[in-house]
A protein has these predicted regions:
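Short glycine-centered segments of the SAM/dcSAM-binding site in methyltransferase folds
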Residues: 78, 159-160
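Conserved core of the PLP fold type I
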Residues: 15-154, 168-192, 196
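Walker B catalytic acidic pair
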Residues: 164-165
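Glycine-rich phosphate-binding segment of PLP-dependent enzymes
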Residues: 2-22
Length: 201
């Protein structure tokens, strides 16, 4: 059976007339507030509620993020994938008529990642970098050192990082399940302000 807490909240929302209104395009304020609190609790990043945008799924969030990133600077018309990743995300870019480049991170771990990323970023056409961490299907996890490299290069080259956290806190080598306590879910958000976190709820 469904959670009684969820059912009660839905009934209360219906009684308050939620079904008679179009949803706020920016998201329900209570949900934005709780998203901000969740990010602080499990990533240890301060993100204002107005920066949290609820969507109907991470794929919609990715689509909107691709659309936004690819239109910020007309000289930056390409998204860079650190693979392995989700093939459907590349398909989204095909649908949009946007360009993308890709490389497999397997041979470019640690310090090698910096040189590989710079070989793309120095061209000046990359608007965003996307990766999944923890990664599915390989289950590799980018280290804090690698996230720092990505973050610092994103700042230097003015690129937006799309961090897909679909498998949030699923690095089971350590317990990431206790809110407001180390260890936290690693994130590029500690190393740059140029980021979008895609969190599946």
């Amino acid at each position: 059976p469904p959670s009684t807490v969820g059912v009660k909240a839905e009934v209360e929302a219906l009684q308050k007339g939620i079904a008679s209104l179009y949803p706020d395009i920016n998201g329900l304020p209570e949900l934005k507030q709780e998203a901000s609190r969740f990010i602080k609790a499990f990533i240890n990043v301060d993100l204002k509620p107005e920066g949290c945008v609820p969507v109907t799924g991470s794929m919609q969030g990715t689509f909107a993020s691709f659309l936004t990133c690819s239109q910020c600077n007309e000289e930056k018309d390409t998204i860079l994938f650190i693979d392995p990743g989700f093939p459907v995300q590349k398909q989204q870019l095909v649908v949009m008529g946007q360009k993308y480049e890709t490389f497999d991170v397997y041979d470019f771990r640690g310090d090698k990642l910096k040189e590989k990323l710079e070989s793309y970023l120095e061209k000046g056409n990359i608007s965003a970098i996307i990766y999944s961490n923890p990664n599915y299907p390989s289950w590799i996890c980018l280290s804090d050192k690698e996230l720092r490299i990505i973050g610092e290069l994103a700042t230097r080259y003015d690129v937006i990082v799309l961090e897909d956290l679909a498998y949030f806190a699923m690095d089971f080598r350590k317990d990431l399940s206790t809110p407001f306590q180390v260890p936290y879910q690693p994130s590029v958000a500690h190393y740059t302000d140029n980021y979008i976190l895609l969190i599946s709820g």
